[in-house]
């Protein structure tokens, strides 16, 4: 009985934190931007899947449900006012094209994050006549005005016409969104509908995780409920606030069952720090003892729950845009804790090679979401020391940063106002380049993933020299005991530790 109970407790423990992977080496790509349907629709991303997989193992897709605005494939409707959850043909492509994209990404070991818009919903032909949600074996639901918050503008705005005063749900548990009907998340029926929707997205389409839109619109505890019911690989919420305390409070409200985008890091370290050459803003002191990269990532209680970013589809269109050196900004987030999220226009543009190179360096050092990162210079320039699974990455940012190489280290990459150094013995294992053909190895959660773009024969050895695996496949995932291993392919040699 004790053994059974212990196992049950371990399963519960894993479930509680499954949505924020521990010591994660994941790196995410936001695979779209505003009105990018013709550049990043489902067929276009399918064609790019192999290139995406060379640098990223997570991709965040735009909302895929049919939405307000006609939903024409290729049209300028982003999907943030969803109309029909169980219809996955949208402006980004057809439902079948979406399935093909997700399957193609999975074949390259890239997990797919859905953009979940459940705070609000658009009516079909009027303010409150919703389409039926038929999820087959996952359930069938029909939302009505009984499920709209009583303080929605349907009840406060006479322009609602015949719908005026008909919303009968409880009061909103968060901020109002006046573009569509705010759903009553206190309703068990609404909760069941949303949970069925997410389970259907996972079961029928293969989505691996959730990005929750407009999380200020409802209490964070409901994200916790949805994640308990659906068990995503990763969950991240858009709680758009530049202050540390509100974002931390939201993470706690979810039961620490979701990550959050690190808006505090974006505003403090990047917009008001690096972009203005104000290097002192790029670090915060943790518990009055140690300077860390600024943002949610500065504290060991929350770096695991942070997704860092430079810009996204919303911020880059207005005064929230980061206006400084883009490569230097990525040098900051790719040498910091949290899971970094790269914005598609940055990756697809002139900075692509530099970003790919920095990603390769982060992986080489094994910098992860909970890495111990110490800021050692914060006045005339920024310098950080990030302890990874394989070694310590030193990063310098700023025109005044010294160019002398730290003792025992090698300069592995540099650009305008940024430099990265790795321990010489680590840098010598494999030259870190931006080559699209480089062998890439990633170890995490008991698995060793090998991306071998050139299709050369590669071998996996233990540290005693015993050959454990040999293959020439372009992508391979092995389940191995926790231990160090050596991967060889031609002249390339990589050392990696499975944990």
List PLM regions with ranges.
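A short alpha/beta connector and helix-capping loop motif
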Residues: 125-148, 223-238
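Active-site-proximal helices and loops of the catalytic beta/alpha 8
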Residues: 20-34, 44-53, 63-65, 70-81, ...
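Alpha-helical scaffold elements lining the catalytic groove of polysaccharide deacetylases
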Residues: 161, 185-197
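C-terminal outer-membrane/trafficking sorting elements
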Residues: 430-499
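Hydrophobic h-region of N-terminal signal peptides that target proteins for export
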Residues: 8-18
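Positively charged n-region of N-terminal signal peptides that target proteins for export
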Residues: 1-4, 499
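Substrate-binding cleft of carbohydrate-active enzyme catalytic domains
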Residues: 93-126, 130-134
């Amino acid at each position: 009985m004790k053994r059974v109970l212990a196992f049950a407790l371990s399963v519960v423990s894993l479930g509680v934190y499954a949505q924020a992977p521990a010591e994660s080496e994941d790196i995410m790509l936001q695979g779209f931007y505003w009105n990018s349907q013709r550049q990043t629709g489902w067929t276009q991303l399918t064609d790019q899947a192999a290139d995406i997989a060379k640098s990223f193992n997570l991709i965040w897709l735009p909302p895929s449900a049919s939405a307000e605005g006609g939903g024409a494939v290729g049209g300028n409707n982003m999907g943030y006012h969803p109309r029909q959850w169980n219809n996955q043909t949208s402006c980004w492509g057809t439902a079948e094209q979406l399935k093909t994209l997700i399957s193609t990404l999975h074949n390259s070991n890239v997990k797919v994050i859905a953009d979940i818009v459940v705070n609000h919903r658009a009516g079909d032909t009027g303010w409150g006549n919703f389409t039926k949600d038929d999820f087959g074996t996952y359930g069938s639901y029909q939302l009505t005005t009984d499920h709209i918050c009583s303080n929605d503008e349907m009840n406060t705005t006479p322009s609602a016409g015949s719908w005026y005063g008909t919303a009968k749900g409880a009061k909103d548990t968060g901020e109002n969104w006046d573009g569509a009907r705010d759903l009553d998340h206190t309703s068990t029926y609404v909760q069941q509908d949303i949970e069925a929707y997410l389970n259907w997205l996972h079961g029928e389409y293969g989505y691996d995780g959730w990005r929750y839109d407009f999380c200020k619109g409802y209490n964070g505890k409901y994200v916790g409920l949805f994640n308990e019911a659906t068990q995503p690989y990763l969950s991240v919420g858009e709680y758009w606030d530049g202050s540390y305390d509100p974002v931390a409070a939201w993470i706690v409200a979810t039961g620490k069952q979701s990550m959050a985008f690190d808006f505090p890091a974006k505003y403090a370290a990047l917009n008001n720090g690096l972009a203005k050459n104000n290097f002192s803003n790029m670090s915060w002191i943790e518990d009055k003892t140690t300077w860390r990269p600024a943002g949610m990532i500065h504290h060991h209680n929350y770096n695991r729950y942070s997704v860092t970013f430079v810009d996204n589809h919303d911020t880059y269109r207005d005064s929230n845009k980061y206006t400084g050196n883009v490569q230097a900004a990525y040098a900051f987030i790719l040498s910091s804790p949290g899971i970094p999220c790269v914005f598609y226009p940055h990756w697809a543009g002139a900075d692509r090679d530099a970003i790919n190179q920095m990603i390769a360096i982060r992986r080489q050092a094994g910098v992860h979401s909970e890495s111990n990162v110490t800021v050692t210079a914060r006045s005339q320039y920024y310098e950080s020391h990030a302890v990874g699974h394989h070694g310590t990455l030193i990063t310098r940012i700023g025109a005044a940063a010294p160019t002398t190489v730290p003792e025992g280290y090698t300069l592995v990459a540099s650009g305008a106002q940024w430099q990265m150094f790795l321990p010489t013995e680590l840098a010598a294992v494999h030259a870190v380049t931006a080559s699209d053909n480089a062998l890439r190895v990633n170890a995490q959660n008991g698995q060793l993933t090998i991306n071998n773009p050139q299709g050369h024969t590669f071998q996996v050895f233990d540290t005693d020299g015993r050959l454990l695996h040999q293959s020439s496949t372009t992508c391979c995932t092995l389940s191995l005991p926790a231990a160090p291993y050596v991967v060889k392919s031609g002249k390339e040699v990589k050392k990696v530790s499975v944990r």
